[in-house]
Structure formats: C-alpha cells, structure tokens
C-alpha cells in the first residue's frame, strides 16, 4: 500500500467532527435524561458511601466522580464533559496541530466518562463503535512530543491498518448477522422494502424509494447482502489497489443511501470515516501530478507483463463477485416484463456452516495482512540513516506493534461472539486480558444485537394523556412517526436518545424497560426538561399549561402509504393499525407505577443540594440558558454550519493570497544556498568583461536591472 498521509488526515478530521456532533447531541439532552428532574437522574449513580477517588475510578472509569472536588452538581459535570469535548474536537477539526495523540486520548476519555454513567440511553451500537474508533485514533494520530521534526513515521501504515481491520469487522459482522440470525425478511429478499419504514428514523426520500417496484427493491436487498459479506472478503485486504478502491466506493454508496433514506446517524458517519483506510495518497493526486511524476519512468517488458497479470486477477475477482451474486440469489432477467427476478438459493443451515468455516479464515487473513504491514514497517526503520535515528525508529516501531498486537488479539473476542461463529479460536490468555480491560471498551461487538426486521409494519409506542380519563390526546415526539399526516422528520446527525429507546422498547413490554416508568413519572409531574425531549415548541405539546392526570401508551404498527392503493390516505405519509395496549393508564399514585419506580431505583429520594455558586457552575448555567429551548437538530446544524463557514473563509482567503503563506526573513535566510566556487569565478570573469570598452548605455542597464532576479524579488 502507498503513502497514507491524506486518508489518515481525513480519518482524524472525520473522527474529531463526529466527536463534536456526539458531545453536542448529548449535551442538549442532559437535563431531560440525567438531570435531577430527568428520566434517569445521574445523581442516583453517585456513591452513597465516600470511597477513595482512585478506587472509584478503577470500579467505573468516569470523570463524573470529580464533581465534588470541582464544586459541581452531577448534571453539571456531564455538561462540562460535553462542552470540553465539543471545544477540543472542533479544535482538532480546524487546527492540524491539535490532531495529536494526546487530543484524541482526551476525547476518548471524555466520551468513556459519559458512556459508563449514561445507562441505557448511551449504550447503542454507534456509541461502542465511537469508543473503539476513538481509541484507535489515539494510535493513528501523531505524537507531537516525539515527532517535533516530522509528522510521519514508518509505523503509520501499521496503525492505519487497524482502522481497516475494524471497518472489516463492522461491515462483515453486520452483513453476516442479517442471515445468521435466520431473519426471514432477508431470506425472501423483502427486507429492503420493510427496512425503509422499519429503520430508526426514516426520511421523506425513504417514502419515495418505498414506492419503487418490488423486484427492484429485492435487487437492492441482494446488493446490500453481497456488499456486506462478499465484497469485504475479497477487496478489503486485497494487495491490488483498484480492488480496495472498488470496495471503498461500494461501501460509500451504501452509507450515502442509508443517510439519505434513514437520516444521518453516527453509525453511518463512522462507517465513512473508517472506509478511508482503503485509500492511499495516489487516489487524491490530480491526473496532472500523476503524469508529471511518471514522465521520466519507462516500463520494462517484465513490468508490463506483471501489470497485465494483475489486471487479469482483478477482472477475475469482479467476475467472481458477479457470478456468485447470480448463482446465490438466482438472478434472472425477464426481457418480456423488463424486470430482474431474485431468490435465495441457500438455506439457513448452509449459511451457518459457511460462517463457521469462514470465521477462522478471516482471522488468519487478518493475521497475515497485519504481519506484512509490521514487517514492512520494520524494514523501513532498518533503512533509516544514522544509528541513533535507526534505533529510535525501531523503539517506536516495537512499542506501536506491541500495542497493535494487543488490540488485534482483543478484537477477536467480540468478533467470535457473532451468531453462527465459534469462540473456540480465542486463546484463554486473550479472554483473561479482555475481561481485565472490558470496562474501558477498547473493542466492541457488532451485529450481535441484530434486530429482526418487522414484516408487519413499523411498531411505535404512542403516548396519550388525559385530564378526566375520557378524552385522550396524543403526545408525539419530534423525531419519530406519530401523526400520520406529519412529514417524516430530519434529525441527523443529532441522535435523539428518547426516541431511539422508545423504538427499541417495542420488542419488550414496559416492565422490561425501567426508564419508561421514569418517563411516565416526569410527564405526569409536568417536568419541563423531559417535555423538552418530546417537543421544544410548547405549542406542539398539548399539556404545556397543565400536566395530564393520566397517561397510557398504545402500540401501533405504521406503514408507508401507497398513493395507488390507499385512496383514503391521499394527504398522509403513514397509515397505522392499532395492535395492543403497551402500558395501562396510570397516575402519580398508581401502585404499579410506584412499584416499577422502586424496582428500578428511581423512587429513591436524594437530598436536594443547594445550588453551588462557584464561577465554573455559574458559567455552565449561562451557557445552558440560550439553547434551552432549541432542538438538538438545530444546535448541531448550527455547529456544522459554523465549521463549514470557517473552512469557506479559509478557501477564499487562500485564493486571494495565491495559496502561499507569508515567508519570514529567517525562513528566506535558511533557504538561501551558499554559492559554489565555480559561480564566484564565473561572476568575476563577467564583471571584468563588463569593465571593458563597449559598455551598455544607461537604458540597457535599466532593462537588465529590471530583469534581475533580485529586482523581481
């Protein structure tokens, strides 16, 4: 693989930007989720007995435990963590000097602090992925203290390879889990049609894509399955550069499709950031630069023969990908009806056997590819000039390789927990090491909690409130379907945690979701912070003047409307069908509600602490007030618009200055080369010749002086 300076820069900038979105999204929701009057007050996690700080950090690594030392309330500590994360990550996006290992270590520690105390609301798959990708960014980013003279080291390709291994695990595990769990929607290839309406937060474009012919949506399901299983196996670790580029663009296309039809989630952004590991610097060079570098190069017949062989192998891989798709999914073109039929040609048992055999093979492919990168980096270190430089490069290589080996070994543990895979390939020592560092979430499992696609429609919990128990009014959140006439919302890259948990809670009853009792309690009490999670606009919330006396929850199944079949829903985007009662009507004195609150620990009384009056506490209050009534999507959109504006100003300024930075006198002095003796002798001969008769007139001298390099300078 060639140089990776540019894709590494893109990866580090992308991770920093994703961190900024994640911290800002959590910050907006802290009062409603974790405040003293929130759904899951974070104060309840504070230790009842005073424990040494070091002991508390060892039990649960989080900066929350520093709150008493800073004179801050638990909620304010979370706000401080988020604000520090936003500032630090934006600094890394805008300033290249801040894209340092120390910066990414701080960002990872800040987000880990949120994750360990965030409960169910912060335990989604993209949170786990952000922690692992963020930790790898610590290894990928340069350590400025050790690289004062150079921003590139020989082991950079090795650390950047770890990003590719993570991207492979994410893509392959997600693709395999669709079929390994026996999901019938993927085996009959109707999954994409149902997925468009059953995903976390469908957009308006998803409604239009859902109207496409059934055969075209089945073909789309084939593309999604083949892109998640076959293409990563054949392209991600291929020694042929064009195959890796093919894998990159396929995954980029899929992620853009998910963003446009299912809102922009952190999972999609992280997948794009990880996909940069398939690129190299040559891909970012312009054609003119490539031609300029190849002008003096002439190919021998042996090089031409090798290039032809590589091209044949590449074409064979493309042909195999196409042939396997046609064979496994029985793709046939019906020229009369102008359609392509598709049907799976394998059973769940056959696929499970395939996964069991391919698992160990993928691990060994990873080991071989990792070994190649490590040996290649070591050879580059050995070729360094100077004994001291060579020794220093080898020391860095040894430390980085040891860390990479440890992370690679740890990643095999969650990778083997995928449905259909075996954990017998994991060594006991590796399992012990994994358990020892599990609380730091250095590696994660992906595809393990695969949610089967609902073929009966999109399940949604609809809250209803009433004053008298006779007239009920719906309380619909901002970022999920409620009123069938409301246009599908745009949320991304904001991550609405409450809507996400309500979507996942449909698989189980309210008894298995302790946070749901806390939600009902706060809505019955009329707490503004929790109401703000549902609607920031008071006019959209029916009980803004007085909280309801009773609240119940119903379970509906939503479907996209069909403009041809649904003649009665011409102005509606959804049609829904009532299924059952999710939660019976309760009030604040209901014994069932109080029992659920007791069981989940939310009924516990904590002493009301007097408001702290420290300068830091007052500053946090001042920062919170202006955005209290703004939606999370608006806050993050404003943040991204600010970053885009700064980059635009930079581009405009660079175009006016010709893209050159002003040079200092010291820089000019350093760049001056000492004159060669031959140049001095030649100059003396020229001067003696000019002193002879036949001198130039004054006008000619003036012209010559204007042409002088010194004059132009």
Whereabouts are the PLM-identified features?
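Alpha-helical membrane-anchoring segments
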Residues: 1-713
């Amino acid at each position: 693989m060639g140089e990776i300076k540019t894709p590494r820069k893109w990866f580090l900038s992308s991770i920093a930007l994703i961190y900024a979105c994640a911290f800002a999204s959590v910050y907006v929701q802290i009062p409603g989720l974790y405040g003293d009057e929130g759904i899951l007050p974070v104060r309840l996690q504070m230790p009842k007995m005073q424990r040494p700080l070091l002991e508390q950090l060892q039990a649960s690594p989080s900066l929350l435990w520093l709150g008493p030392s800073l004179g801050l309330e638990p909620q304010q500590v979370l706000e401080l963590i988020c604000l520090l994360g936003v500032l630090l990550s934006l600094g890394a996006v805008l300033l290249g000097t801040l894209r340092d290992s120390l910066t990414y270590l701080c960002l990872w520690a800040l987000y880990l602090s949120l994750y360990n105390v965030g409960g169910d609301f912060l335990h989604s798959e993209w949170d786990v992925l952000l922690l692992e990708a963020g930790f790898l960014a610590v290894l990928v980013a340069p350590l400025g203290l050790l690289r004062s003279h150079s921003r590139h080291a020989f082991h950079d390709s090795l650390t950047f390879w770890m990003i590719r291994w993570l991207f492979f695990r994410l893509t392959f595990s997600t693709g395999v889990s669709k079929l390994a769990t026996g999901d019938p929607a993927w085996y009959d290839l109707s999954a994409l049609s149902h997925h468009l309406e059953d995903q976390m937060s469908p957009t308006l474009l998803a409604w239009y894509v859902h109207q496409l012919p059934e055969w075209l949506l089945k073909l789309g399901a084939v593309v999604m399955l083949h892109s998640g299983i076959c293409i990563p196996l054949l392209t991600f670790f291929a020694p042929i550069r064009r195959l890796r580029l093919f894998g990159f663009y396929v995954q980029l296309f899929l992620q853009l499709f998910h963003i446009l039809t299912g809102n922009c989630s952190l999972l999609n952004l992280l997948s794009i950031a990880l996909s940069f590991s398939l690129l190299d610097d040559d891909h970012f060079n312009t054609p003119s630069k490539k031609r300029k570098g190849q002008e003096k190069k002439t190919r021998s017949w042996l090089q031409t023969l090798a290039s032809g062989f590589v091209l044949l192998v590449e074409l064979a891989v493309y042909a195999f990908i196409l042939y396997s798709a046609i064979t496994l999914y029985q793709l046939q073109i019906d020229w009369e009806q102008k359609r392509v039929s598709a049907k799976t040609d394998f059973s769940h048992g056959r696929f499970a056997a395939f996964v069991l055999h391919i698992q160990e093979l993928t691990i060994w492919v990873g080991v071989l590819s990792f070994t190649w990168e490590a040996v290649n980096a070591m050879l580059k270190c050995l070729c360094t000039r100077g004994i001291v430089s060579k020794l220093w490069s080898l020391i860095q290589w040894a430390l980085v390789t040891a860390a990479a080996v440890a992370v690679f070994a740890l990643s095999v543990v969650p990778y083997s927990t995928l449905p259909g895979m075996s954990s017998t390939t994991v060594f006991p020592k590796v399992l012990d090491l994994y358990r020892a560092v599990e609380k730091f979430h250095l590696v994660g499992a992906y595809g393990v909690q695969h949610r089967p696609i609902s073929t009966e429609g999109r399940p949604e919990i609809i809250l209803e409130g009433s004053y008298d128990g006779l007239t009920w009014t719906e309380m619909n959140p901002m970022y999920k379907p409620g009123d069938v006439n409301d246009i599908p919302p745009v949320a991304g890259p904001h991550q609405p945690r409450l809507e996400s948990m309500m979507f996942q809670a449909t698989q189980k009853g309210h008894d298995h979701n302790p946070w749901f009792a806390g939600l009902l309690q706060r809505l019955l009490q009329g707490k503004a912070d929790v109401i703000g999670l549902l609607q920031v606009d008071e006019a959209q919330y029916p009980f803004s003047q007085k909280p309801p006396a009773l609240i119940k929850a119903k379970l509906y199944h939503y479907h996209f409307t069909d403009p041809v079949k649904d003649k009665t829903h011409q102005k509606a985007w959804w049609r829904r069908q009532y299924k059952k009662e999710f939660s019976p009507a309760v009030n604040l004195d209901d014994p069932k509600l109080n029992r659920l609150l007791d069981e989940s620990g939310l009924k516990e009384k904590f002493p009301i602490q007097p408001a702290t009056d420290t300068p830091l506490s007052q500053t946090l209050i001042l920062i919170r007030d202006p955005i209290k009534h703004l939606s999370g999507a608006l806050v993050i959109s404003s943040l991204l618009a600010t970053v885009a504006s700064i980059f635009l100003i930079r581009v405009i300024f660079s175009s006016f200055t010709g893209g050159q930075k002003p040079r200092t006198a010291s820089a000019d002095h350093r760049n001056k080369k000492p004159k060669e003796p031959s140049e001095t002798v030649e100059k003396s001969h020229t001067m003696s010749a000019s002193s002879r008769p036949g001198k130039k007139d004054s006008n000619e001298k003036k012209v010559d002086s204007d042409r002088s390099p010194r004059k132009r300078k």
